[in-house]
C-alpha cells in the first residue's frame, strides 16, 4: 500500500505520516520546502518522540520525499499508483496542491481502485474544499462524474498538539502522546481504508465542531490570555488561576452551544473538557503561546474558533456568550512582532472603526445578535 502525503512539516511527520506508516503504508512526502525534502530524502528514518506521563519514541522508515515544486511529473506518477492521498498544509494552501492531485487522478489506470483523498486540516469540510479546488484543476475532457469514479473524498477531524521544534532535531519531531483522527465513513460505502489509528464515524459534523470549539478554542484562549499575563508557554499560562478560569468559562459556553446544537451529552463534554485542559498542562510539551496565537486574523474569522461557537451560542442557547467575547478581546490585543497578521490587526485597530472590523474581520453583519456585543469588544480593545 502507498500513501502520498502533502505537507512534510511537523504535523505531517509527527501525526499523519506516523499513523500511515504504522498502518503499513509506504509514505511519499511532498512539500515545497526544498531544504526539508532534501533532509528527508537523505534520511533512512526519523524518530517521533511522544511526550506525556511517559516518553515513547517511535521510528518511521520506508518513506520517500519529493519536492512538489520541482518534481511534479514524478509526483503525478506517485499519485497515479497510490491508495491514499492526505494533506496537512493548511486550508489556504489546498488550492495549490489540488492541480497536481487532479493530474494524478487523470493518470490513474482504467479500472484502478478509487483513490482515497483526505484533507487533515484544522477546518470544517476541508476535504470538500479540496474536492472543489480539484474540479477547477481537471484536465480537458474530464468530468465531475469521471472524477467521482476515480476518488473517494472523506472529511476528517484531526487532533494532536505539535509544538515548535528544536532546530537541532533535524527531521525528528516531538509531539504529545494524545491524538485523534476521526473520518467520515459515509463516502466509503463500507470499504474504509485500513488505517487502524483512524476512527470512522457516521456523522462527522459534531466531532469536528467538538474538536475545533474545544481544543482549538481552548488552546487559542490560553495563548491570548496567557500572552497578556506574560506567560511564555501554554503549560505556564494554564497554571495561572486567572487564565484557567477564563479558559474554563469559554469552554463551558462552547459546550453549551454544542449540546444545544448537536445534542451532545453534557457529562461527556465535561469529561472531554477536563481531558483537554490536562493536555494543555503537559509540562513536557514546550508549546509557546506565540506559536499558538499567531495568525489572529484567521482565528477571528466567521467560522473559526471564536466567532463560530459564539454564533452558535447566540443562536441555539440564546444571549451573548460573555466569556467568548472576552476571549475575542484578548485576541485583539495579541500584538506580536514578526507576525504579519498581528501587525495587520493592530493597524486595523488603529485606523478602522469598530463596526468595520466586526464586519470585515469577523464576518458579522449589522443586525446579527453578535454585532453590537462585538462592536463593544472592539471599541474596548481600541482604547
Swiss-Prot record:
Keyword set includes Ubl conjugation: no
Protein name stated in the entry: Mannitol-1-phosphate 5-dehydrogenase
Organism the protein comes from: Leifsonia xyli subsp. xyli (strain CTCB07)
Highest taxon listed in the record's lineage: Bacteria
Pfam families (UniProt xref): Mannitol_dh (PF01232), Mannitol_dh_C (PF08125)
Gene name as annotated: mtlD
Catalysed conversion reaction: D-mannitol 1-phosphate + NAD(+) = beta-D-fructose 6-phosphate + NADH + H(+)
InterPro entries cross-referenced by the UniProt entry: 6-PGluconate_DH-like_C_sf, 6PGD_dom2, Mannitol_1_phos_5_DH, Mannitol_DH, Mannitol_DH_C, Mannitol_DH_N, NAD(P)-bd_dom_sf
GO molecular function: mannitol-1-phosphate 5-dehydrogenase activity
